[in-house]
């Protein structure tokens, strides 16, 4: 298989597909989603009236007990189909393991195997109700890793006390090193400027030499830190080489809920992280669950929202925007050695309905086709508009 100009003339007896000069990029990477939660927003008892993170966790805790493996898989399949048809071929999903039955984990592990030929999925052992605030949460995380989860998760800002939060961060590092796993922590997902677990996570990962294997998801509190502290923090973040994930639509929805006016946007310092050369990427996070009732798995929508909210409209930023849902996400998943369009790597790519990066962002274009290991996952026919009005043709 080959990509290049005039292949139909070079290989007259071989099927060729004319990309018509459209933009070829690596597949989208969604580095933060919760597949076990998708399409639960309208279930009885799941409605989040305050729109806060903490009510979302409460609603999930109260409704998750009756879920079955088959029901979770049925919902997650819908989300996976949407993400794949929007161009995603790599994904990292958190799965709630504060459930002694491991219902969600078993369901998503089965789906990971079922979909392995069309999308790569990393699974995070995520203690949604706390590693220590939920009795035996640390043991459940460890058991999930033994069962096959790929990544260690935590949620230190949700623990009952600061000390318990710090303990959970250190336990995450310990488990990752013990089982040779990656790390992805829900970190400082709050407007509280005193929530500073990202500092501890960066320090511990740096001192243990695993910064590049570590990710801080959300880090919303960084948007509320005073600049003197943030300036000091950035030195450590650069040293650690830790990754960051921002979820623009989710963060702007959940944060700022305790403000009157002015209201905070609730995102981490994406622009500043990017300008400092610290790896940062965007993600979907939720698809219609107790935290966020909308979402459809289209990362182009996430990118558009993120660039607006983060004041990243400089022309060069727009020209490089796709990095935030492609190469930066791949680095976060630590798959950069096999990801990308290069000789010797799998022929995985998507074709966007645009001629260049700027126009792709400008029009929020769709994906014309997706190719994986040299085979088409799908082709999309161009949009046809039927009109008799000359000015609209």
What are these regions (language model features)?
Residues 22-44, 190-191:
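Di-metal (Zn2+ and/or Mg2+/Mn2+) metal-binding site signature of metallo-dependent hydrolases
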Residues 39-72, 148-151, 197-215, 220, ...:
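Active-site gating loops and adjacent loop-to-helix segments of metal-dependent hydrolytic enzymes
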Residues 59-75, 124-136, 156-163:
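Active-site mouth loops of central-metabolism enzymes
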Residues 103-117, 134-243, 260-282:
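Histidine/acidic residue-rich metal-binding segments in metalloenzymes
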Residues 303, 343-393:
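C-terminal cap of metal-dependent C-N hydrolases
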